[in-house]
């Protein structure tokens, strides 16, 4: 199947990676048209959800320190739209250099943004990278410096 850019946003286009948070990157794709072609109408004859896992979620805390975690995003099948995958990745990457604060503030932002984009109430669970319950990850030997108290204002090579 060939998708048109107008119908599916940035899919298939060369894209610049965002340097700051932007919820407008989320590109919804309406479920109704595909369901109508399949003869599926409301009420839906099934239940379900789309589950997205973000294994490399990162953002900055209020002091500018990088934070990392894993996220599970659940979008109900009853939502008006799904989110186009490339736009979802760009949205997640837009968080990387943005001062957000703690993981709860990030979770609230993501719930609001994704719920608005898909037209349904989503759930987001964020797990710290150091406590990946439910995400089978093997840890390497070494010293974790993620919790070191420092203020960071410059993110480039040494001057």
Please provide the spans of the model-predicted regions.
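N-terminal intrinsically disordered, cationic/polar leader segments
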Residues: 1-159
């Amino acid at each position: 199947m060939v998708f048109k850019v107008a119908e599916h946003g940035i899919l298939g286009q060369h894209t610049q990676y965002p340097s700051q948070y932007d919820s407008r990157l989320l590109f919804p794709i309406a479920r109704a048209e595909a369901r109508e072609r399949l003869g599926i109408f409301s009420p839906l004859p099934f239940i379900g959800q789309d589950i997205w896992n973000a294994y490399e979620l990162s953002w900055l805390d209020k002091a500018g320190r990088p934070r990392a975690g894993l996220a599970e995003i659940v979008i109900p099948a009853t939502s008006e739209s799904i989110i186009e995958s490339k736009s979802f990745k760009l949205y997640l990457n837009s968080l990387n250099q943005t001062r957000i604060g703690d993981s709860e503030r990030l979770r609230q932002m993501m719930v609001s943004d994704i719920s608005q984009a898909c037209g349904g109430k989503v759930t987001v669970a964020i797990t710290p990278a150091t406590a990946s319950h439910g995400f089978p990850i093997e840890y390497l030997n070494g010293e974790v410096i993620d919790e070191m108290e420092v203020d960071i204002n410059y993110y480039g090579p040494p001057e």
